[in-house]
């Protein structure tokens, strides 16, 4: 009896399953005819009734095996037909019921042969130009979600149906509705994971639609496309990597960080897991390393972490080849950047072994017409150099050529990255190598970018390696074709950077090249028209003085001014106003201070040669201006050593005298003004003895008297003052004939248009009168003095009270010579004056003086 009982119990589940299936079949059979009715409302009500039945069937605890038969036999074919129903509501309910049925069915994969063609038919467009068969966006989304569900439930069973699935996905990936595209991306990735052994046969057909969608306006769609592409290629054909690289590279410029993060993660995943990844190392590595320079710390951290894993994995896979390098690890190069951590051996080897393939593309992109491309390529270059280290030597020529071009970029970010790259070259490459190339480049065509590269490599170079080359570099920089290669401020600024870099790196080692450095700095100060640059050059000169261990830049000039002037003045015969040599000469004269007095043997002969009437007038004006400034401070300039008197004859006879001669023209007048100003500065200083002033007067008095008629007010004023000075120092020793020629010329200046000139002339006339007072035979001058009295009395009635006051003082002082004569002359004209006040004051003064006598 026991055996039949056990059989009955075992059969019970089967009976229950059959009973449930039969009951479900009966329930469905009552509703199915409603699906065939022509009434849209009738079909909808039938579908709604079916929905209630199915929701009851899929309740927890329901038997999926009992559901499988009625579902596959009765419902599935009818629901699939209803996906094409004219009524949108019926199609939506049909899709929903299919979703419920797939989730409940015991063997959902059995539905795939009928489901996938139906989905493909509703999603795939027969032609790209035509709209999809399913016009409703929400329904298309539901159909793609249904396809995704089928992929998740069907797994490897989808392999025979890949064509239909891929056809539907291609349409979904290009759907106008963004949500459909995102769902399509997720479904494509799921399909790749579900059919790893067969997916490669269809994967390439998805790449085209994915790449068409990768620039979609919604960033979430772009992220989904990138992630889906990563999975599709991972499980599909590696040949598609070439098709997506340019699109991925473009996404690294995306404004949305999540998109760049997705590219970084996918590329890193490929480098770790792609089956034939070794074939694409040189293509994928630049993409991952580009994220090292991303503005977002999270992306940089992701890229760094992935790259470390890639390098470590490659190192482990190639351990046999790297055995020696692993056993005898090389230390970091000297002067290794402090803020950089050295990449692992695997990472360094990966870059080094692929550098020849990567560099040409980087060097091409760094000069691209698109700004973003140039910036990215420039940022990548220092990252590569940091990995390649001294292996960059074999590629140095192409890198330097690229940097030379890129450093002219208007984008500061590009130039900044190039500077960083050049500094790394200085760190990793021997100076013998990079100097040979860079100096040859500068010798061939000096440029601002070439100098910037040189300054940068010097900054990155270790001091002990650079020390033997300091003099060579400084000498090359001091060559005319480089230090005088351009007057452009940017060029000069980069030239200054070279000097600053050498002083900063080599410090005391620069003493041997101090003269060359000074010459370069003087050139920069001479040629530059930017005040800021001149200040920087002066500050650098102070640094050079510190390196030389001397107190100041003035002492630096004192040490080298002789050699500088000797080299510089050798070509003075070829100078013009804009000659660099002349500009340098003027800088030395104005900046060297007391050192000028130690090099008069070069300064004065050069001035004599350049200040001849036959030379460039504008150059003469410039030099006279500088000479005048020096003569105003002789103890701090030309006479600092008390040697200027030895060159006085040359200054007076060969420089001043020729330039005081009258010549027609405004320029000639300006030169006379400059020359007379120099003469005034000379004789008003304390460096000349009375005898030397007398000698100057004997030589120059005729020319100075002639300049009293000059058109320039300044010239006339200076001439009056000079004559006054000559008379004070040597008037009583002049020959009578020459002495008498002075006062008529001064009298004419009392009618000058300038009151300053008139007053200076009056002062000189007073000095002339005092000179007669000191002479023994003053009676011989009575007629001349009487004439002078008469003329001065005319100006005593001048409209200008200041002139009247000045003339009155002259007459009072001069009355001591011949007071009776002056009284007669005054009384003769007093009634002619508009006001007798000044004449009465003069007469009163003479009466007082007579009483005192």
Curated annotation (Swiss-Prot):
GO MF annotations, alphabetized: dynein intermediate chain binding
Protein's name according to its UniProt entry: Dynein axonemal assembly factor 5
Subcellular location: Cytoplasm; Cytoplasmic granule
Annotated positions of the N-acetylalanine modification: 2
An annotated GO cellular component: nucleolus
Keywords noted in UniProt: Acetylation, Cilium biogenesis/degradation, Cytoplasm, Repeat
Pfam families registered for this protein in UniProt: HEAT_DAAF5
GO biological process: cilium movement; inner dynein arm assembly; outer dynein arm assembly
UniProt similarity note: Belongs to the DNAAF5 family.
Origin superkingdom: Eukaryota
HEAT repeats: 69-107, 200-238, 240-276, 278-316, 374-412, 597-636, 694-732, 736-774, 782-820
Tissue specificity comment: Expressed in ciliated cells including ependymal cells lining the lateral ventricles and multiciliated epithelium of oviduct ampulla.
Function comment: Cytoplasmic protein involved in the delivery of the dynein machinery to the motile cilium. It is required for the assembly of the axonemal dynein inner and outer arms, two structures attached to the peripheral outer doublet A microtubule of the axoneme, that play a crucial role in cilium motility.
């Amino acid at each position: 009896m026991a055996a039949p009982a056990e059989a009955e119990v075992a059969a019970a589940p089967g009976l229950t399953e059959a009973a449930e299936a039969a009951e479900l079949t009966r329930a469905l059979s009552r509703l199915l005819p409603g699906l065939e009715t022509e009434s849209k409302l009738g079909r909808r009500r039938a579908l709604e009734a079916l929905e209630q039945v199915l929701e009851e069937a899929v309740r927890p605890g329901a038997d999926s095996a009992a559901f499988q038969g009625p579902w596959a036999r009765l419902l599935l074919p009818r629901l699939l037909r209803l996906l094409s129903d004219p009524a949108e509501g019926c199609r939506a309910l049909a899709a929903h019921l299919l979703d419920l049925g797939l989730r409940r069915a015991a063997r959902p994969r059995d539905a795939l042969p009928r489901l996938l063609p139906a989905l493909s038919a509703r999603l795939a467009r027969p032609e790209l130009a035509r709209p999809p068969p399913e016009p409703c966006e929400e329904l298309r989304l539901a159909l793609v979600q249904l396809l995704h569900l089928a992929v998740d439930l069907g797994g490897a069973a989808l392999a025979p149906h890949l064509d239909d699935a891929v056809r539907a996905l291609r349409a979904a990936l290009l759907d106008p509705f963004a949500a459909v595209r995102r769902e399509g991306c997720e479904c494509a990735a799921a399909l790749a994971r579900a059919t790893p052994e067969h997916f490669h046969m269809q994967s390439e057909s998805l790449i085209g639609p994915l790449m068409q969608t990768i620039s979609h306006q919604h960033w979430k769609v772009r992220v989904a496309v990138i992630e889906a592409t990563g999975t599709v290629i991972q499980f599909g054909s590696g040949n598609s990597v070439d098709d997506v690289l340019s699109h991925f590279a473009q996404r690294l410029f995306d404004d949305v960080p999540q998109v760049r993060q997705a590219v970084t993660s996918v590329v890193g995943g490929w480098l770790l897991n792609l089956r034939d990844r070794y074939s694409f190392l040189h293509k994928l590595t630049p993409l991952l390393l580009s994220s090292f320079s991303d503005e977002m710390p999270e992306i940089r951290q992701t890229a760094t972490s992935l790259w470390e894993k890639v390098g470590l994995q490659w190192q482990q896979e190639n351990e046999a080849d790297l055995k020696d390098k692993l056993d005898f690890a090389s230390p970091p190069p000297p002067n290794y950047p402090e803020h950089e951590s050295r990449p692992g051996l695997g990472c360094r080897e990966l870059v080094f072994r692929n550098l020849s393939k990567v560099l040409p593309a980087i060097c091409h992109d760094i000069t691209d017409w698109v700004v973003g491309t140039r910036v990215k390529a420039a940022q990548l270059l220092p990252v590569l150099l940091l990995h390649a280290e001294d292996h960059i030597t074999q590629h140095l020529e192409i890198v330097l050529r690229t940097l030379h071009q890129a450093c002219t970029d208007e984008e500061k970010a590009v130039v900044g990255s190039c500077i960083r790259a050049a500094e790394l070259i200085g760190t990793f490459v021997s100076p013998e190598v990079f100097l040979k190339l860079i100096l040859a480049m500068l010798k061939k065509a000096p440029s601002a970018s070439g100098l910037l590269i040189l300054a940068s490599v010097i900054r990155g170079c270790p001091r002990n390696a650079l020390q033997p080359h300091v003099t060579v570099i400084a000498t090359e920089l001091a060559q005319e074709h480089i230090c005088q290669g351009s007057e452009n401020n940017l060029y000069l600024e980069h030239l200054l950077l070279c000097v600053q870099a050498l002083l900063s790196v080599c410090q005391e080692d620069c003493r041997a090249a101090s003269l060359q450095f000074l010459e370069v700095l003087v050139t920069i100060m001479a040629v530059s028209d930017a005040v800021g640059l001149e200040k920087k050059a002066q500050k650098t000169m102070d640094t050079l003085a510190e390196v030389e261990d001397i107190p100041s830049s003035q002492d630096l000039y004192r040490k080298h001014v002789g050699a500088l002037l000797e080299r510089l003045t050798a070509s003075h015969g070829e100078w013009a106003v804009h000659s660099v040599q002349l500009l340098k000469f003027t800088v030395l004269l104005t900046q060297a201070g007391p050192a000028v007095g130690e090099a008069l043997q070069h300064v004065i002969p050069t001035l004599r040669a350049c200040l001849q009437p036959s030379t460039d007038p504008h150059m003469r004006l410039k030099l006279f201006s500088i000479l005048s400034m020096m003569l105003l401070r002789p103890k701090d300039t030309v006479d600092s050593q008390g040697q200027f008197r030895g060159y006085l004859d040359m200054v007076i006879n060969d420089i001043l005298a020729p330039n005081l001669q009258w010549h027609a023209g405004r320029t000639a007048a300006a030169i006379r003004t400059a020359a007379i100003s120099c003469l005034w500065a000379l004789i008003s200083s304390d460096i000349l003895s009375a005898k030397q002033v007398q000698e100057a007067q004997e030589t120059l008095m005729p020319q100075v008297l002639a300049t009293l008629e000059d058109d320039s007010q300044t010239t006339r004023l200076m001439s009056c003052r000079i004559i006054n000075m000559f008379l004070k120092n040597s008037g009583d020793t002049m020959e009578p004939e020459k002495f008498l020629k002075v006062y008529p010329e001064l009298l004419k200046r009392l009618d000058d248009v300038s009151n300053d000139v008139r007053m200076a002339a009056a002062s000189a006339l007073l000095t002339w009168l005092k000179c007669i007072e000191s002479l023994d035979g003053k009676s011989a001058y009575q007629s001349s003095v009487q004439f002078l009295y008469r003329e001065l009395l005319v100006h005593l009635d001048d409209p200008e009270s200041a002139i009247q006051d000045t003339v009155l003082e002259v007459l009072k002082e001069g009355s001591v010579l011949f007071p009776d004569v002056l009284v007669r002359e005054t009384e003769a004209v007093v009634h002619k004056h508009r006001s007798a006040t000044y004449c009465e004051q003069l007469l009163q003064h003479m009466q007082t003086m007579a009483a005192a006598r």
